[in-house]
């Protein structure tokens, strides 16, 4: 009798224990199903401990949940496209120039380095920076997501340094084009004056930008002076001529510039193009010209340098010292300028 009673009592206790475990597990499952993703993993761990044979599945769920949370945490907005214009001309190739010894580029004067392949073009602009025209040129280039080489005049950089900084900010290559656009091949200029024009031009660009430009130089009017060329070689400055002169400074309108460039380019097949961001008609012509280049299958090559140009400290200092700063006056405008008749 006692044995039977003991067996009955053990059965009741066992049933109660099983019911308690079942209820706790069921509650955990309901809680797990309703819980947000961020806390399901801990609940799954609790469920795994309570359910024999479920440890492997729970561990797998934990890994999947953790991976999902990590993936959500690392998702970032898609990167902005490098170019907003899907049909842009763009830049097909960037070349790095070693300027040691002063290499020359442009078949107008130099025949040694024929690095452009068929349909490749380098865009170059002289004589800036200048209000309205240079910003218009920059916009046209930016709209086509393409790059150029700029050869600014030193004096112009002191007049409009903020525009030259826009050129740099847009990612274009910047060289120099003398201090005052002097003809260095003129008999009126001696070797020392020519060197001063070169060095002062580079220092002016550096002063405007806040950093040294590329060691790229173009002679004004493409007037190459032998002594000056030798000097450029000692300073490891690359000399730029051109393959194709747009003669934009002679053009009566934008259409003439476009026709001149495309006619020559279709005949030659490639080349370094010389233009002027100083010229109004060039700024007007550029959007259409870039579209014509794209339609004609031409590709843009950007030229860069391995190392920035090392300006001469004494020239930098002299240029800063010689810069004329307007004298501020405490007098009001009305006491200086008065309208007496209108």
Language-model region placement:
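Catalytic grooves of carbohydrate-active enzymes
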Residues: 262, 266-304
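Residue-level detector of anion-binding/catalytic polar loops
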Residues: 147, 173, 238, 245, ...
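Active-site beta->alpha N-cap acidic-glycine motif
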Residues: 79, 83-189, 197-204, 213-214, ...
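Alpha-helical scaffold elements lining the catalytic groove of polysaccharide deacetylases
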Residues: 133, 182-209, 223-269, 282
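Active-site-proximal beta-strand/loop segments in catalytic clefts of secreted hydrolases
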Residues: 125-128, 151-155, 178-179, 218-222, ...
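Short low-complexity, flexible loop/linker segments enriched in glycine and/or proline
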Residues: 164-167, 189-192, 255-258, 315-319
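A short acidic, amphipathic alpha-helical/loop segment
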Residues: 136-137, 162-163, 228-231, 285-289
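N-terminal pre-catalytic segment of deacetylase/amide-hydrolase enzymes
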Residues: 2-123, 130-136, 143, 292, ...
